C-alpha cells in the first residue's frame, strides 16, 4: 500500500506540473509488464478519474533497455515523453545527460508541491540524488535480489518446505535432490550479472571492480577473477552441466519460468513478486540471496535494483508549471 501511495503521489505531482486549460495529456513511458503493467494502468486510471484537467497516458515501451533506447531516440527527435521510467543501470547515463532531463526535485518545487525525500529508505533516496542534495528522479519501483522457491516441489523432493536454503552449498544440494525427483529445471536465475555478480559481490562484502567499484574514478576495471567469483561460477557451471541449474537467458528472461512452475528455484528481483503472487498455482516461499558461509563479512547487503521516473526536458515552459 505504501508503494502504491508513493507511486500515485509521483503521478499526481508530475501531472500537476502542466497547464490547466483543456485536458492535457502527460505521456508516461514505462517497462512494467504482466501484473506490474496492470498496476501502472490502475495508477493512471485513479489519477485520471480524480480530476479533469490532465490525463496521464501510460505506454509500455518494452524491456528496460528498449524503453531507455526509445526515450533517447525520442528526445533527439524532439518528441520525448513527459515522464520515462529508467532502470537503475541507466541512472548514470541519465544523470550525465545535461539538457535532457529536468530534476524531479526542481519540477516539484517549481510546482509548489511539498515532497519529502525522507519518505524513502535513505539508500534509495541517496542513489537518485545529486551532490547538491537535489533529487534528480523519483524512485518508483526500487527492488533488491531475493530467492524464490516452490514449496510443493520441495516436498516432492523430500526437502523441508519451510526451510529454504540459506547458503550456496545448500542451494546446489537442494537442486540435485529436485533433479533426482524428476524436476527438469531445479534452479535458474534472472538478471544474472546483477544477481550473480553485482549483488553477489556486495552480499559477500567483496568488491567486483577497482576504484572502489568505480566510485573513486571512471577508469575502473572489473575484478571478477577473484577466488570467490571463480569458485561461484565454477559451481554454477558444474550445476549447469549436470542439469541442476538451467540458464534461461539474459535480463529477466527467466522470470516466467518460476511462476509457471517450470523452475523450482530462482534468484531474481523482488519486483517479480507481483507476478508470482498472481500466476503461481503452487505454494511458494521467499528468502534472502544465498551466500557462502565461510566468507568473512557475509552476508552484508545487496545492490539497489528497479527503476525511477525521470522528467524529460524540451517541453513548453508552461507545462512545467503547476
Name what the model sees in each region.
Residues 8-11, 22-98, 110-116, 161, ...:
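Conserved N-terminal structural module of periplasmic/extracytoplasmic solute-binding proteins
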Residues 49-50, 77, 133, 157, ...:
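Extracytoplasmic/periplasmic substrate-recognition and gating elements
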Residues 60-70, 166-172, 246-260:
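Short helix-initiation/N-cap motifs at beta->coil->alpha
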Residues 82-85, 264-269, 285:
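Paired acidic/hydrophobic, glycine-rich loop segments that form the ligand-binding mouth/hinge
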Residues 87-146, 172, 198-202, 285:
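Hinge/lid segment of periplasmic solute-binding proteins
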Residues 105-120, 164, 206-231, 278-279, ...:
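Short, solvent-exposed loop/beta-turn-alpha elements that line the ligand-binding surface or hinge
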Residues 129-140, 145, 155, 169-221, ...:
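Extracytoplasmic/periplasmic solute-binding protein
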Residues 172-178, 217-248:
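Glycine-centered hinge/linker elements that transmit conformational signals in sensory
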Amino acid at each position: 500500500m505504501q508503494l502504491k501511495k508513493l507511486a500515485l503521489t509521483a503521478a499526481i505531482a508530475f501531472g500537476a506540473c502542466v497547464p490547466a486549460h483543456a485536458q492535457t495529456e502527460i505521456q508516461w513511458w514505462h517497462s512494467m509488464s504482466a501484473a506490474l503493467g496492470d498496476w501502472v494502468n490502475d495508477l493512471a486510471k485513479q489519477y485520471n478519474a480524480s480530476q479533469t484537467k490532465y490525463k496521464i497516458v501510460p505506454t509500455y515501451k518494452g524491456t528496460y533497455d528498449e524503453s531507455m533506447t526509445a526515450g533517447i531516440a525520442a528526445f533527439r527527435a524532439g518528441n520525448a515523453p513527459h515522464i520515462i521510467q529508467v532502470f537503475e543501470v541507466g541512472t548514470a547515463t541519465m544523470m550525465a545527460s545535461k539538457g535532457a532531463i529536468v530534476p524531479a526535485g526542481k519540477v516539484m518545487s517549481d510546482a509548489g508541491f511539498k515532497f519529502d525525500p525522507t519518505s524513502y529508505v535513505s539508500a534509495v533516496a541517496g542513489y537518485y540524488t545529486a551532490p547538491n542534495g537535489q533529487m534528480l528522479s523519483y524512485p518508483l519501483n526500487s527492488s533488491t535480489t531475493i530467492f524464490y522457491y516452490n514449496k510443493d516441489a520441495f516436498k516432492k523432493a523430500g526437502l523441508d518446505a519451510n526451510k529454504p536454503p540459506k547458503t550456496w552449498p545448500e542451494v546446489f544440494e537442494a537442486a540435485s535432490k529436485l533433479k533426482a525427483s524428476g524436476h527438469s529445471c531445479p534452479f535458474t536465475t534472472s538478471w544474472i550479472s546483477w544477481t550473480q555478480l553485482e549483488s553477489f559481490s556486495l552480499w559477500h562484502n567483496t568488491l567486483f571492480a577497482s576504484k572502489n567499484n568505480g566510485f573513486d574514478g571512471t577508469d575502473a576495471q572489473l575484478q571478477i577473477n577473484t577466488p570467490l567469483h571463480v569458485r561461484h561460477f565454477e559451481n554454477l557451471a558444474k550445476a549447469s552441466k549436470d542439469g541442476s541449474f538451467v540458464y534461461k537467458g539474459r535480463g529477466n528472461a527467466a522470470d516466467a519460468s518460476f511462476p509457471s512452475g517450470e523452475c523450482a528455484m530462482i534468484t531474481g528481483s523482488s519486483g517479480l513478486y507481483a507476478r508470482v503472487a498472481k500466476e503461481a498455482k503452487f505454494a511458494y516461499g521467499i528468502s534472502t540471496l544465498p551466500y557462502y558461509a565461510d566468507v568473512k563479512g557475509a552476508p552484508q547487503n545487496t545492490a539497489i535494483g528497479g527503476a525511477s521516473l525521470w522528467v524529460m526536458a524540451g517541453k513548453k515552459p508552461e507545462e512545467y508549471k503547476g
